């Protein structure tokens, strides 16, 4: 009845505000899978050591709502000192995952967008098993290498599984 409608002040504006708050809870990150240029061996991916997580992780960046692929290319180019014209980026998949954030010490909901990056000409120094660029330590690791690393398994197995399912389908 009319009395009940006026008593309950929850309307479409409040609903929209609640939806926007929920959206902010989600942490949007673009994951980057870069395969080692040598295709004869087991597939290896580029990971880096993240000090906040104390773990080797896939390259990742906060997702940009518009022009995310361009943003990913720009960031990979800057991080690895590779000319942007040498980088091809392809969207693979998305997945919403709840996981514990080592850096924030709490469970968080992540919306991961996975991109495959191909670099046409990889700098020779960056083809070594591990290397440092711009102060960041990088490693080439296969999925099975990652699955054998207890620290990666403990902190990031859900992301490893997501990449494995998406890239090896």
Question: Can you name each region flagged by the protein language model?
Answer:
Residues 1, 18, 51-65, 124-169:
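Nudix hydrolase/Nudix homology domain
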Residues 2-6:
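Alpha-helical transmembrane segments
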Residues 8-47, 64:
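Conserved N-terminal beta-strand and adjoining loop/helix that marks the start
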Residues 35, 114-120, 140-142:
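Short, well-ordered beta-strand micro-motif
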Residues 39-83:
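Conserved Nudix-box catalytic region and its N-terminal flanking loop in Nudix hydrolases
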Residues 83-96:
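A short coil-to-beta-strand element that immediately follows conserved catalytic motifs
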Residues 87-88, 101, 141:
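Polybasic, proline/glycine-rich intrinsically disordered low-complexity segments
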Residues 96-129:
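Active-site-adjacent beta-strand/loop module that shapes the phosphate/pyrophosphate-binding cleft
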């Amino acid at each position: 009845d009319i009395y009940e409608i006026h008593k309950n002040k929850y309307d479409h504006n409040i609903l929209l505000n609640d939806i926007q708050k929920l959206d902010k809870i989600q942490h949007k990150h673009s994951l980057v899978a870069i395969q080692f240029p040598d295709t004869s061996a087991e597939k290896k991916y580029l990971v880096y050591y993240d000090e906040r997580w104390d773990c080797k992780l896939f390259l990742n960046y906060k997702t940009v709502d518009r022009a995310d692929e361009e943003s990913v290319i720009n960031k990979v180019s800057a991080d690895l000192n590779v000319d942007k014209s040498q980088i091809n980026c392809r969207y693979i998949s998305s997945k919403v995952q709840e996981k514990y954030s080592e850096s924030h010490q709490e469970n968080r909901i992540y919306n991961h967008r996975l991109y495959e990056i191909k670099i046409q000409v990889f700098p020779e120094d960056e083809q070594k098993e591990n290397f440092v660029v711009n102060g960041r330590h990088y490693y080439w690791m296969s999925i099975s290498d990652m699955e054998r690393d207890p620290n990666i398994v403990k902190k990031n197995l859900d992301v490893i599984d997501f990449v494995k399912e998406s890239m090896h389908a």
